[in-house]
């Protein structure tokens, strides 16, 4: 936020807004070593949205996380996206994650990667991962990337 030349007052206001939005107010004065892994990840995501970016690129941000934490953080990103209006480009190899998060999915070919298909996903959030339409879309995407 310093790089955007925001005043100290504006930076502090935005920091407090994001901390409140993420339910992290009580950790405002904590050091990273004092945070749990999940809280630290929430801070990282909040920090990215705090800049009010027009576009946020997230390249497999949940790669090392357990499934429970992954689901939780996916919902956090959806909530922040709705609250801020930031466009999020999410890169993943996880089909279920793509179908859960995205409004649009680009299916790529094998190397050299080219766009094979652009798929719009018109399901409301939060998405029901066991719902028939979700399962149908997930199966369709899986079928499109099979090369074996």
Question: Residues of each region from the PLM?
Answer:
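Conserved ABC ATPase "signature" region
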Residues: 2, 9-27, 79
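Conserved ABC ATPase signature
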Residues: 31-35, 39
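Hydrophobic anchor residue at the start of the ABC signature
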Residues: 45
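A short, proline-enriched helix->beta-strand linker immediately N-terminal to the Walker B motif
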Residues: 50-54
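Catalytic Walker B motif of ABC-type/P-loop ATPase nucleotide-binding domains
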Residues: 56-59
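Helical segment within the ABC ATPase nucleotide-binding domain
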Residues: 70-84
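Conserved H-loop
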Residues: 86-91
């Amino acid at each position: 936020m310093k790089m955007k030349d925001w005043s100290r007052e504006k930076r502090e206001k935005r920091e407090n807004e994001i901390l409140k939005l993420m339910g992290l107010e009580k950790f405002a004065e904590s050091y990273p070593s004092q945070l749990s892994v999940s809280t630290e990840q929430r801070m990282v995501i909040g920090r990215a949205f705090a800049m009010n970016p027009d576009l946020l690129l997230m390249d497999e941000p949940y790669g090392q996380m357990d499934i429970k934490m992954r689901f939780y953080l996916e919902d956090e990103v959806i909530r922040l996206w709705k609250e801020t209006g930031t466009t999020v480009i999410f890169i993943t190899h996880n089909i279920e994650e793509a179908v859960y998060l995205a409004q649009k999915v680009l299916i790529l070919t094998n190397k050299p990667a080219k766009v094979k298909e652009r798929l719009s996903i018109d399901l409301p959030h939060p998405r029901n991962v066991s719902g028939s339409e979700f399962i149908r879309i997930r199966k369709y995407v899986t079928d499109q990337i099979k090369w074996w």
